[in-house]
Amino acid sequence: MAYKLLIINPGSTSTKIGVYEGEKEVLEETLRHSAEEILKYATIFDQLDFRKEVILKVLKEKGIDINELDAVVGRGGMLKPIEGGTYEVNEAMVEDLKIGVQGPHASNLGGILSNEIAKEIGKRAFIVDPVVVDEMEDVARLSGVPELPRKSKFHALNQKAVAKRYAKEHNTSYEDVNLIVVHMGGGVSVGAHRKGRVIDVNNALDGDGPFSPERAGGVPSGELLEMCFSGKYSKEEVYKKLVGKGGFVAYANTNDARDLIKLSQEGDEKGSLIFNAFIYQIAKEIGSMAVVLDGEVDAIVLTGGIAYSDYVTNAINKKVKWIAPMVVYGGEDELLALAQGAIRVLDGVEEAKIYK
């Protein structure tokens, strides 16, 4: 049976929705919200009714009857750290999404919106693999400073989706393989997946790992300390150097990887150096994760928007091919990944997890 699903993925200035029948996309729409509309609301949670009305209006215009839906799936938000999987939305989750226990983020509305619409039609609401998925082993959490433990914040939804895709295409299960998955987008996350769990991964938002189009990755801590207390920068300005204006933006004044690739291909000296450093850092992180997996790696999987570039993937493969074969799944399909998570539960392949 092909289940009919509504998928909701809220961003800061847009809400992406999809309607799926099984894994087949019936509708995909990006509902854009102007700055003026968003600024009317003091908090992200205050946008709930506004976004819900916009979603229902578009569904009606497109001839989608919400009463025909089997479930509603939202993108998971900044909840407490949880293990990966599909979670049924409950009151405890809604309360934590309202307050944003790990910070404000538009994705916090995903679970709440899906719950609101599902309640109206008497159906179930789910979230799947939010960014706060944390399956790290205790040994990976120590940083050297007890007050600063390493944290798991990464592209969990896409990393898990492509890992499961690899397993399916190789006639095995995600729980039976060891993979290193590299997501390359605005941020870069490199995860060690051992038998269905991400036992180590860099904090791709503001922690460690390779630099990326907009993020600094791991930086020398002593120099960062000097910068913080130099009196030249506010806390916000330093944070912006790490997230938003780090990486490619800092070195080349662009957040578009294609610009760096072009400069490197043309032999531009500075552009080539930045590009080579980007490849070097990703390959180095892959090497680290190979050690985490005791050298037992079935494949290295590259994904995210930058993985569409053969120039990038070939350069990485040249450095890491001695570890394991490489597989490339360019881009990311968050709506499909959310749909697949719900289908696994509705089909009885997995049980819905309970958020506490």
From Swiss-Prot:
Phylogenetic classification of the source organism: Bacteria, Bacillati, Bacillota, Clostridia, Eubacteriales
An annotated GO cellular component: cytoplasm
EC number: 2.7.2.7
Compartments it resides in: Cytoplasm
Similarity-based family: Belongs to the acetokinase family.
GO MF, one example: acetate kinase activity
Keyword line: ATP-binding, Cytoplasm, Kinase, Nucleotide-binding, Transferase
Pathway as given in its UniProt record: Lipid metabolism; butanoate metabolism
Matching CDD domains: ASKHA_NBD_BK (cd24011)
Any one biological process term the GO annotation gives: butyrate metabolic process
Top-level taxonomic group: Bacteria
Task performed by this protein: Catalyzes the conversion of butyryl-CoA through butyryl phosphate to butyrate.
Catalytic activity: butanoate + ATP = butanoyl phosphate + ADP
Name recorded for this polypeptide: Butyrate kinase
Pfam families per record: Acetate_kinase (PF00871)
